[in-house]
Amino acid sequence: MGPLLRSSPPPRHLRLLLRRLLSTAAGRPSRLLPLPASSSARLLVRPRVAVAAAAAGAPLRRNGVAVRAFMASTAASEAMQEKRVAGEYTAANVQVLEALDGVRTRPGMYIGSTGSRGLHHLVYEILDNAVDEAQAGYATKVDVILHGDNSVSVTDNGRGIPTDIHPQTKKSCVETVLTLMHAGGKFGGSKSGYTVSGGLHGVGLSVVNALSEALEVTVWRDGKEYRQNYSRGKAITMLTSRTLSDESSSRQGTRIRFWPDKHIFTTTMDFDFNTIAGRIRELAFLNPELTIALTKEEDDLQVQHNEYCYAGGLVEYVKWLNTDKKSLHDPIAFRKEMDGITVDVSLQWCSDSYSDTVLGYANSIRTIDGGTHIDGLKTSLTRTINNFAKKSKTLKDKDISLSGEHVREGMTCIIAVKVPNPEFEGQTKTRLGNPEVRRIVEQSVQENLTEYLELHPDVLDSILSKSLNALKAALAAKRARELVRTKSVLKSSSLPGKLADCASSDPEESEIFIVEGDSAGGSAKQGRDRKFQAILPLRGKILNIERRDEAALYKNEEIQNLIVALGLGVKGEDFNKEALRYHKIVILTDADVDGAHIRTLLLTFFFRYQKALFDEGCIYVGVPPLYKVERGKQAHYCYDDADLKELVNTFPTNASYHIQRFKGLGEMMPAQLWETTMDPERRMLKQLKVEDAAEANVVFSSLMGTRVDVRKQLIQNAASMVNLEHLDI
């Protein structure tokens, strides 16, 4: 691969959002090929296949995106493969992968991907083990260190992994749990070492070991310190021990330090401090008695260090999420234990919020796809509030009731359950399936919420008023919602007039560029490949839906155009990716403050209206070049000042060259826009995904909400990240 360019740093407003919230491209884009100066003329042929670019020396890209830039899955060649003649199939063709070889062969089955998300999942596996010790009542402190050599160590003061010989394996227990799949102390029953835990399958520690170039384990227990080294899942030293001094003889705990295998994680080896901090913050909120410290050691001896301890637990979590909102009451919190299952809930309504935030956890594991605990919460909450509404005659019409969406508008709720034998879906544990949990949660919410609201009639009145206003707004928006549904059914016959659609009707290959204004829209329409690229120009800044209710949202023409053009459906309904008209939605705005503002408004709209777009990997940001440098018959494009400087330094001192700075997409010729920003073989895109939904919610509320003081504080806190010389005002 040729020399690489740096990623363009986000402008002032979006920098805050991208740094704290969204995972973007890992690594640097491949340098664009030098183009002849005459290439600004109209291109007649635009092949999509990667063969032409590869023949010219360009890096191979997949589906219009640089493979190594940010894609989580392993890239596969799109070239046609030769047909193979079927041969004899015998026992000799069957492979038996021993020990942890299967993990190394198919790592994505265990950690989700071999990209940034999978890399960070290794940390979470070890961290969750330490938290399990805290949930069992044995650990009070966990230290996580991101070392300068790209290794990570996690140390807890729990009981320490047992070191005696296991009766079945005839190896030490440490080596057993590190080298064998499904070996652990969390399978439940009388022989289990844990009553409640996030680990269930006995594979977390062994998977991390298998995917690490090196791993060191240190155990303190029984007055001794034990050490052993591993490499790619296999022990390379014996378990050694030494007697601790009298001062340290009572020390207990475990430390795991691992170096990820660069042959497995080929796209990135960098651990992000903020990403890991988001997960640690969650765990600290969920475990009030636990203190977790996070430290990052830099090469220049600088150290980032934070400690997380929240004695208030879920109440503090809700307060943190609603920091910048106008709350209607103090957080409501309650706990119930039944049949060995513990339910903790904290919730609060806010007057200036028009969406709900419901976060569910099972044994401190975030269940991003919900589950029976979330279903039970929503059902019981809706039933309880409706009972109060009818009893107080707030709802006078017997045929009208408040839907769950009306009741939850403006609500922030955290529910955490502890289940002795949880039924998770898959190793990544994204959904809880225990049917008995739903029954217990429903009963807990109904009993405790009813009791609280009866004792606090003022809070009840506020919630009913908020819910009733949501119902009225929904009825007012119903006509517009039906219009959206009608337009969606009619599809092409009712698409927005400014939309330049593509010829393809296959959403998988189709992509749409949302551009800023008619000027940029004109260039983009002329420069695109009409076969699979659509263009939707925006008229100025769209509505900030963070501050408006649903009725205002559907009445806004630009918002309607977005909904219909993209096929987003109606807010609140289940997301259906197949209904999307394009599976790649590219935000393409100018590289100035206004462009950053429009980009942020669009991200706010997508996050609040249909967050699943981020989960499905449909949202991208296009990165146009800032400079065009012409020297002789060659033209080079640079994405930031650092890249420009790097390029100019390659020229002789007496070289003659011309630099053109693009302040807007409208300044670029259609062919230039194609060559640099829209051509799948040359362009750079950043795929945006939400790694931490709670953090994302806080950032959007702070940045786009009604509280000016909170927004000002956020900008001031992040001011040190901005280089004033790079501002384009």
UniProtKB/Swiss-Prot annotation:
Key word Metal-binding present: yes
Question: The Toprim domain covers which part of the protein?
Answer: 510-617
The record's principal subcellular location, in a coarse class, is plastid
Instruction: Name the GO cellular-component terms.
Output: chloroplast; chromosome; mitochondrion
Compartments in which it is found? Plastid, Chloroplast; Mitochondrion
For this UniProt entry, the molecular function terms from Gene Ontology, in alphabetical order, are: ATP binding; DNA binding; DNA topoisomerase type II (double strand cut, ATP-hydrolyzing) activity; metal ion binding
Sites binding Mg(2+) 1 sit at 516, 590
Its Enzyme Commission number(s) read 5.6.2.2
Question: Where along the sequence does the record put site: Interaction with DNA?
Answer: 541, 544
Q: Which Pfam families match?
A: DNA_gyraseB, DNA_gyraseB_C, HATPase_c, Toprim
Sorted keywords for this record are:
ATP-binding, Chloroplast, DNA-binding, Isomerase, Magnesium, Metal-binding, Mitochondrion, Nucleotide-binding, Plastid, Topoisomerase, Transit peptide
The catalysed reaction is: ATP-dependent breakage, passage and rejoining of double-stranded DNA
What does the cofactor field's note say? Binds two Mg(2+) per subunit. The magnesium ions form salt bridges with both the protein and the DNA. Can also accept other divalent metal cations, such as Mn(2+) or Ca(2+).
The record's comment on protein family reads: Belongs to the type II topoisomerase GyrB family.
Q: Quaternary form? A: Made up of two chains. The A chain is responsible for DNA breakage and rejoining; the B chain catalyzes ATP hydrolysis.
Please state what the protein is called.
Answer: DNA gyrase subunit B, chloroplastic/mitochondrial
The organism's taxonomy opens as: Eukaryota, Viridiplantae, Streptophyta, Embryophyta, Tracheophyta
Encoding gene per record: GYRB
